[in-house]
């Protein structure tokens, strides 16, 4: 176990222990004669052992110097004090399944070097009878393990190897394991993306880099947060040291070390192999980059790729691994018999998991094991000694190797977990394009020196013409999503039984439900106005009969004094008098309603013995009605606030002093009245925020829908944000979002203060701020990791991707919106903006036009009762990035020129859902965008051609160039939108570099004449365009 506090996942332990005992009861693979199983793990140089795999599979950790004894009716664990505490949650009667026997722990006794404990365990083994199962071939070097093995020998216990039985047990992965393996594959493919970019940089700039240096760089990618992004919070490492090979020195052994020789980046093939080991689960990837390949080498690559795909397709449940091997050999032989001769025929892959390579489940000619659904295989095909004639002797021999990690599915195609690292030929070919020397007549010797020889630039298929292909693929995928969208929406809404809103039943405001409750006060008997504060009613006399009115029926009342009389006017709520949500509260709107009543009373005493005048009753009634109305409206507002709010479970406090904790945090919104700091601490089932004043706010894990951690990089605050599933009532208000943050740096700056560029105080303060930001990021990140471990990865924090952010106006002010793995958020400004992508039906772009600088984005949710969410004023330059992001999230989008009234649109849809989908559903949004595409296609002939522009500029005199310079610049700016169409016609990076070089040459030619022109006065027309002035 590591130095960090570990927590045993109780449910997962019993789930897997139950699988183990069921496998044991079947008696397969020699387990029928085994009555007990004993395992111990110690120090070893081998990172992959069956014992460590068993401990990781059962407990989630490699637990050294601990004996695990499994009997049919009991489980014993011998370990140190800390390890006994680790198993505390599963000992005694804590088990959740009757199939798993009781777990007991024994505390190590170092006084006799555990001789007494060993004797107890051996007695239990002998009582069980039969042989003890063990991984006989595994050797460990620790003193504790040696003592245990010696005790077994002295006790006469016979060991029996059960490696094959546990190989079959570990081979089929459960849902938790599949999830971790998928994440491991994501880390592997993310590292390959970074490695591929590194290769392009090396080849393009002709750098000399050693194979061993690249191996270390690729290993670092596994832990680089910029490469892994959301996966950086997991414990990830490499399965083995990355292997980088080129220049004819190739080996297909997994323990091959990358050489100290330099990478051959100008010819042949570069083979790269590495894999991620995330949370102890392994995946692997091998790719071959072809550098300026011959046609024979490309054909060989296609044949090897076809053989790999054939092996992947043959790995179906029920198939023998030897038959799968034969299919791979036959496919390669059919494609190219010569390649089959130099194939690495030992095996074409193997099963993987916690152990990188399971040799007993290898795809080889002699392995007759049967494939099962849920198994994970690494398919690896490598061929050596392939001729590469184009590059002479140096390019021979070449080698090609391709490897992927796949998950066997019960039905349908197998899942290629590393599919994002594309293995197709055009994604792994690098070619050079020799740029011809500029042969135009140039008289200036400086220009010739500047031009030099022709340059070489890397041309990747994905960088040039394939952009058009990617755009077409995106459009095809969007069409598929559009069809699926209507089908799924129609099916979903039909199950819901229509989209009609359920009207909330309003509380019946009846004054007195029984006659006994009617007041018998003296004012009622005297036919005066009586205000009953107990039942929120007003009793007024009408034709000599006291009539009660509930306070909710009184719209308002007014009092006036005219001469000797006081008037009280009461206006009642009637149908049609109220407009809004409460307009439909009348049960019988067609009945007769009283609109107003006016009472008059004298201000003069009727008799000198009276203590008050008759008008006193009206004045008192007026005051009490006003007070009652105010109180009733306040209570109604509180009840409305409580609607939808849930009462959280009780927070279970953890007594451990090492609970994850953050101090000096502020809270938003202002649940606590005063702006004071506090601490946030993670407990067993939730968080508790405690202010310095003692205020407490609890947030439970099971009510958190999304948890976000936003670092303080380029931000003024660092924060943790919780978006809740159900609103929670804190105080008298309900909240669905709560945020804990710390301010970083100065929010305001004194502009009147004198600043010097080399002011030591300012430089020191900036350095201190950078250091503080680093410490804060580390502290918050550590808190998130500890919470994740505390909850056994059941609770995770999501972080926004700053690189995918874009500006927009979700409410009233412009903010930066950033995507996360599951949402689009803005957490810095308040109120926060959070859209859950899984709840989004589609996205529509409004006001998309070349004449406009901004557009709007509207989110339509799967629940049509929810009001669509709009983000306005997004810069047009961000639309392609947003489309690509939505495409990767499999969200259908559409665009149009006009802005729609979404309240009316949604009402029309929900009024008649069947008719809406029969008429095409949401496809009506794409009508405008289809028309726009047709108009764009008709304008392709007017696209800007830089080469023609260069020719016309080169043929003119220097003075002509000066005069036309501003016009050319404006033309470049205006025609910027047409560059995409030029690229679709085959323009690559080298062409663009050539145009830039030509522009620089012309600029240098023009510089001397400009210098001369500056010495004499110029007219306004002869100067450069204002767009060129800086």
From Swiss-Prot:
The UniProt entry, under Gene3D superfamilies, shows: 2.30.29.150, Creatinase/methionine aminopeptidase superfamily, Creatinase/prolidase N-terminal domain, FACT complex subunit Spt16p/Cdc68p, Pleckstrin-homology domain (PH domain)/Phosphotyrosine-binding domain (PTB)
Pfam families xrefs: FACT-Spt16_Nlob, Peptidase_M24, PH_SPT16, Rttp106-like_middle, SPT16, SPT16_C
A GO cellular component annotation in the UniProt record: nucleus
Q: Which InterPro entries match?
A: Creatin/AminoP/Spt16_N, Creatinase/aminopeptidase-like, FACT-SPT16_Nlobe, Fact-SPT16_PH, FACT_SPT16_C, FACT_SPT16_M, Pept_M24, PH-like_dom_sf
Annotated Acidic residues bias: 929-951, 958-983
What's the main place this protein lives?
Answer: nucleus
Localisation per UniProt entry: Nucleus; Chromosome
Q: Name one GO biological process term.
A: nucleosome assembly
Q: What is this protein called?
A: FACT complex subunit spt-16
Q: State the organism of origin.
A: Caenorhabditis elegans
């Amino acid at each position: 176990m590591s130095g960090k506090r570990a927590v045993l996942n109780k449910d997962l332990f019993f789930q897997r222990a139950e699988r183990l005992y069921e496998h044991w009861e079947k008696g397969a693979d020699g387990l029928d004669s085994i009555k007990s199983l004993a395992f111990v793990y110690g120090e070893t140089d081998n990172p992959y052992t069956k014992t460590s795999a068993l401990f990781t599979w059962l407990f989630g950790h490699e637990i050294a110097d601990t004996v695990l004894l499994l009997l049919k009716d009991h489980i014993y664990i011998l370990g140190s004090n800390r390890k006994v505490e680790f198993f505390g949650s599963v000992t005694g009667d804590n088990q959740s399944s009757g199939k798993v026997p009781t777990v007991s722990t024994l505390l190590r006794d170092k006084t006799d070097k555990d001789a007494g404990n060993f004797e107890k365990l051996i007695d239990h083994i002998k009582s069980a009878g039969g042989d003890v199962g063990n991984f006989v071939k595994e050797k460990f070097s620790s003193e504790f393990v040696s003592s245990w093995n010696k005790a077994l020998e002295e006790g006469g216990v016979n060991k029996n190897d059960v490696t094959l039985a546990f190989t079959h047990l570990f081979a089929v992965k459960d849902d938790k394991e599949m999830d971790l393996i998928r994440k491991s594959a994501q880390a592997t493919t993310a590292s390959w993306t970074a490695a591929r970019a590194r290769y392009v940089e090396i080849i393009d700039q002709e750098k000399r880099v050693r194979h061993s240096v690249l191996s270390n760089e690729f290993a670092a990618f596994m832990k680089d947060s910029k490469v892994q992004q959301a996966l950086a919070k997991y414990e990830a490492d490499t399965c083995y040291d990355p292997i980088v090979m080129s220049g004819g020195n190739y080996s297909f052994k997994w323990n091959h070390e990358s050489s100290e020789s330099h990478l051959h980046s100008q010819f042949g093939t570069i083979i790269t192999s590495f894999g991620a080991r995330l949370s102890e689960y392994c995946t692997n990837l091998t790719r071959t980059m072809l550098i300026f390949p011959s046609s024979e080498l490309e054909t060989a690559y296609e044949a090897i790729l076809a053989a790999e795909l054939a092996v992947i397709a043959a790995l179906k449940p029920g198939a023998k691994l030897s038959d799968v091997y034969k299919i791979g050999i036959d496919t390669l032989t059919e494609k190219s018999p010569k390649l089959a001769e130099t194939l690495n025929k030992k095996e074409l892959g193997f099963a993987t998991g916690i152990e990188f390579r399971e040799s007993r489940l290898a795809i080889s000619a002699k392995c007759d094991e049967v494939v099962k659904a849920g198994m994970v295989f690494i398919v690896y095909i490598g061929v050596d000694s392939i001729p590469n004639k184009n590059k002479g002797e140096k390019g021979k021999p070449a080698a090609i190797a391709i490897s992927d990690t796949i998950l066997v599915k019960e039905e349908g195609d197998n899942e290629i977990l590393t599919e994002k690292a594309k293995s197709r030929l055009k994604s792994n070919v690098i070619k050079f394009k020799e740029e011809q020397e500029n042969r135009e007549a140039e008289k200036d010797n400086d220009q010739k020196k500047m031009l030099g020889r022709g340059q070489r630039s890397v041309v990747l298929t994905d960088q040039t013409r394939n952009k058009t292909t990617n755009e077409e693929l995106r459009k095809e995928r969007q069409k598929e999503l559009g069809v699926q969208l209507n089908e799924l929406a129609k099916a979903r809404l039909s199950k819901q039984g229509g989209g009609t809103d359920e009207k909330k039943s309003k509380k019946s405001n009846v004054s007195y439900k029984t006659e006994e409750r009617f007041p018998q006060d003296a004012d009622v008997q005297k036919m005066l106005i009586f205000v009953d504060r107990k039942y929120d009613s007003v009793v007024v006399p009408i034709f000599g009969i006291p009539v009660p009115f509930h306070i909710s029926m009184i719209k308002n009342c007014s009092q006036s004094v005219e001469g000797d009389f006081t008037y009280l006017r009461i206006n009642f709520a009637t149908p049609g008098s109220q407009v809004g949500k409460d307009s439909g509260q009348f049960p019988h709107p067609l009945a007769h309603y009283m609109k107003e009543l006016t009472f008059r009373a004298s201000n003069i005493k009727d008799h000198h013995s009276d203590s008050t005048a008759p008008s006193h009753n009206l004045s008192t009634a007026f005051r009490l009605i006003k007070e009652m109305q105010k109180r009733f409206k306040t209570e109604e507002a509180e009840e409305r606030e409580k609607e939808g709010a849930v009462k959280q479970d009780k927070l279970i406090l953890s007594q451990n002093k090492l609970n994850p904790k953050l101090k000096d945090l502020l809270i938003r919104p202002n649940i606590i009245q005063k702006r004071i700091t506090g601490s946030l601490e993670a407990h067993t089932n939730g968080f508790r925020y405690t202010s310095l004043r003692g205020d407490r706010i609890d947030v439970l894990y099971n009510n958190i829908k999304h948890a976000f951690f936003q670092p303080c990089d380029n931000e003024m605050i660092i924060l943790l944000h919780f978006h809740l599933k159900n609103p929670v009532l804190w105080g008298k208000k309900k909240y669905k979002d709560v945020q804990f943050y710390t301010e970083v740096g100065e929010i305001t700056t004194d502009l009147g203060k004198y600043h010097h560029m080399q002011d030591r105080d300012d430089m020191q303060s900036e350095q201190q701020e950078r250091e503080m930001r680093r410490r804060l990021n580390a502290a918050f990140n550590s808190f998130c990791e500890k919470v994740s471990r505390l909850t056994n990865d059941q609770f995770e924090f999501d972080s926004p991707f700053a690189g995918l952010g874009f500006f927009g106006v979700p409410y009233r002010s412009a903010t930066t919106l950033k995507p996360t793995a599951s949402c689009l958020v803005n957490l810095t400004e308040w109120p926060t903006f959070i859209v859950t992508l899984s709840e989004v039906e589609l996205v529509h772009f409004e006001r998309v036009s070349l004449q406009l600088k901004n557009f709007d984005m509207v989110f339509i949710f799967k629940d049509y009762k929810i009001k669509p969410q709009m983000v306005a004023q997004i810069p047009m330059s961000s639309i392609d990035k947003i489309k690509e992001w939505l495409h990767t999230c499999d969200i259908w989008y559409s665009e149009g020129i006009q802005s729609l009234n979404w309240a009316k649109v949604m009402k029309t849809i929900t009024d008649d859902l069947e008719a809406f989908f029969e008429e095409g559903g949401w496809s009506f949004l794409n009508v405008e965008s289809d028309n726009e595409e047709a108009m764009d296609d008709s304008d392709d002939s007017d696209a800007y051609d830089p080469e023609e522009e260069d020719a016309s500029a080169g043929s003119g005199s220097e003075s002509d160039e000066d005069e036309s310079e501003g016009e050319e610049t404006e033309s470049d700016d205006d025609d910027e939108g047409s560059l995409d169409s030029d690229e679709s016609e085959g323009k690559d990076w080298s062409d663009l570099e050539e145009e830039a070089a030509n522009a620089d040459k012309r600029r240098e030619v023009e510089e001397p004449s400009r210098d001369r022109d500056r010495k004499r006065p110029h007219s306004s027309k002869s100067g450069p365009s204002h767009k060129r002035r800086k």
